[in-house]
Amino acid sequence: RRILCASPDFLQRYGTPKALSELPGFACLVIKERDHPFGIWRLHNGTEEQSIKVTGPMASNHGEIVHQWCLDGQGIALRSYWDVKDNIHSGKLVHILPEYFQSANIWAVYVTRLAMSAKVRVSVEFLRRYFNEHYGAENTSANGGTLKR
């Protein structure tokens, strides 16, 4: 899952958005990704998906740079929960508009000839359980954690 977050300093200076429709009025930190339209955040609230066009003073194609800018109080970021979890728990970042999120998949990639390997099966199952346990992933694979060719 990806969530919206910002530093307490940023929120103190500029306020906290109370609704998704307010995001375009805030400085957002955008990651340039190959397969995604620039500055369009597709967010779910559990029942529906909304697309929102955001802009901001800075953009990067490197997620860790955007993460650091967020910590530095430069704007609102859309980051993977596993990436910002510790910062949220320590108070360095604040989870904003918590009812909204973006789905994010984690893939285990391996060659077809290893699909039936017990080691691969055990490793993938371990990762599925780990991410479910530690990061609240609803489903870490498209087929429920089972391997298929």
Which residue ranges define each predicted feature?
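Short, hydrophobic alpha-helical packing/hinge segments within bilobed ligand-binding/sensory domains
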Residues: 65-67, 84
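Beta->alpha turn/N-cap motifs
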Residues: 6-8, 79-82
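Short beta-strand-to-loop elements that line the ligand-binding cleft
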Residues: 30, 51-62
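Hydrophobic residues within well-ordered alpha-helices
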Residues: 23, 69-73, 88
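C-terminal effector-binding regulatory domain of bacterial HTH transcription factors
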Residues: 81-86, 90, 100-149
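Flexible hinge/capping segments at coil-to-helix
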Residues: 1, 5-31, 46
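Ligand-binding cleft/hinge of the Venus flytrap
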Residues: 22, 39-53
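Paired acidic/hydrophobic, glycine-rich loop segments that form the ligand-binding mouth/hinge
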Residues: 75-79, 95
